[in-house]
Amino acid sequence: MVTAIYPGTFDPLTRGHEDLVRRASGLFDKLIVGVADSRNKKPFFSLEERLTISNEVLGHYPNVHVESFSGLLKDFVRRHDARVIVRGLRAVSDFEYEFQMAGMNRYLLPDVETLFLTPSDQYQFISGTIVREIATLGGDVSKFVFPSVDKWLKEKIAAQG
């Protein structure tokens, strides 16, 4: 049984993230979506909210499990005896950072592979940062996120005044 981990902040989970989960879940026996605590990034949604949102969107995949983690990805990967780390590459600008991270992960976890997946064409330009910016400025992000995520965004923005 091969377990893979798809780590990220998922702030918020977008249609691009779900696209990668859908495709990666077909490649592995078990896919764990690791929602990173990422306090240093000062996320828009709390860790608990991001877990709830991720479970709402991804809960119908039978071999996908959503779980939070903090600290080193290496420790999370070891705890789950995962063999693969899944990462998304939207553009060349993502590649340099992801290449460095893959190299460090290979050093720390020599028996674990990093698999890069590119999003489907319609999702190549979507990022959580862009979605948050559009939403907080009053724009429509419904084409980039699932209805439940759109609702979460609108409620959070309204609560912040």
From Swiss-Prot:
Top-level taxon in the UniProt lineage: Bacteria
Native source species: Janthinobacterium sp. (strain Marseille) (Minibacterium massiliensis)
Subunit-structure text: Homohexamer.
Keywords for this protein: ATP-binding, Coenzyme A biosynthesis, Cytoplasm, Magnesium, Nucleotide-binding, Nucleotidyltransferase, Transferase
A single Gene Ontology CC term: cytoplasm
Key word Acyltransferase present: no
UniProt entry tagged with the keyword Membrane: no
Protein name: Phosphopantetheine adenylyltransferase
Similarity comment: Belongs to the bacterial CoaD family.
Cofactor: Mg(2+)
Gene Ontology terms: biological process: coenzyme A biosynthetic process
The protein's enzyme class: transferase
Residues binding substrate: 9, 41, 73, 87
MF-aspect GO terms: ATP binding; pantetheine-phosphate adenylyltransferase activity
Catalysed transformations (reactions): (R)-4'-phosphopantetheine + ATP + H(+) = 3'-dephospho-CoA + diphosphate
Protein's cellular compartments: Cytoplasm
Gene3D superfamilies: HUPs
